[in-house]
Swiss-Prot record:
Record keyword Hydrolase present: yes
Subcellular location: Cytoplasm
Gene: pepE
Name of the protein in its database record: Peptidase E
Pfam families: Peptidase_S51
Reactions this protein catalyses: Dipeptidase E catalyzes the hydrolysis of dipeptides Asp-|-Xaa. It does not act on peptides with N-terminal Glu, Asn or Gln, nor does it cleave isoaspartyl peptides
GO biological process, one term: proteolysis
EC number of this enzyme: 3.4.13.21
Length: 236
């Protein structure tokens, strides 16, 4: 079995319905996976059942059997029993805190490395990398470690945009990621623009969607990556 992981920048593009833009990306991962477990732990400001319902509705045309991990008395067993894993967006720090709390970090990694499909968006993409050190989120809670799932052996920054609002004097996203590369000049960071996604199939990694991604690594800053690019070298 080989890794089959889809990392979406966001759950929406513009004003599109929830997850609708991602259906063409998600569908290939569901061909042999009917029973999915959804992990809503990033959803701090919403009820987990409400969050689950939005995911079920958003993916309804795929006719999947989706349950929330919070509905199961044994989260680890529920994850083992599922054919695939879905992790949604929200607060990355809270998500990782809960994954450690329920002893799921290593288990998710093991299941994905054995071939269980993984689909994440926003925070769910953040935790697929080496660590959550390049998330955009406020650190509202302290997880035991920033170390994440390591499904992708580099850093991710979903919702990437270097827009600076007129009159705003805070750092841009590119400046924040530059700070990371000054502290860690070896580890690459991929900024994924909304509407785009990374898809890992075994030892192959590609960029899907309509917008370029951006590479930050050492002296390389905000290097555009065209859609369709083969990024497999980043898995080495």
């Amino acid at each position: 079995m080989t890794v089959n992981a889809l990392l979406l920048s966001s759950s929406r593009v513009g004003d599109t319905p929830y997850l609708s833009h991602a259906i063409p990306f998600i569908k290939p991962l569901t061909a042999d996976a009917q029973k999915w477990i959804f992990i809503p732990y990033a959803g701090v400001s919403m009820n987990y059942d409400t969050y689950l319902a939005s995911v079920v509705t958003g993916l309804s045309e795929l006719k999947l059997d989706i349950s929330g991990i919070h509905q199961h008395p044994d989260p680890r067993q529920a994850l083992k029993d599922a054919d695939g894993i879905l992790i949604g967006g929200g607060n990355t720090f809270h998500l990782l805190h809960e994954l450690y709390k329920y002893d799921l970090v290593q288990l998710i990694r093991e299941e994905v490395l054995k071939g269980k499909p993984y689909i994440g968006w926003s925070a769910g993409s953040n935790v697929s990398g080496l660590s959550i050190r390049t998330t955009n989120d406020m650190p509202i809670i302290e997880p035991p470690s920033f170390a994440a799932l390591n499904i992708l052996p580099f850093q991710l920054n979903p919702h990437y945009s270097n827009y600076r609002a007129p009159g705003h004097n805070g750092e841009t996203r590119a400046q924040r990621l530059l700070e990371f590369t000054r502290v860690d000049p070896i580890t690459p960071v991929i900024g994924i623009v909304e509407g785009s996604a990374l898809w890992r199939q075994g030892e192959t990694l590609s960029l899907l969607g309509e917008n370029p991604a951006y590479l930050f690594c050492g002296e390389q800053q905000e290097i555009p990556i065209p859609v369709g690019s083969d990024l497999s070298h980043l898995l080495k």
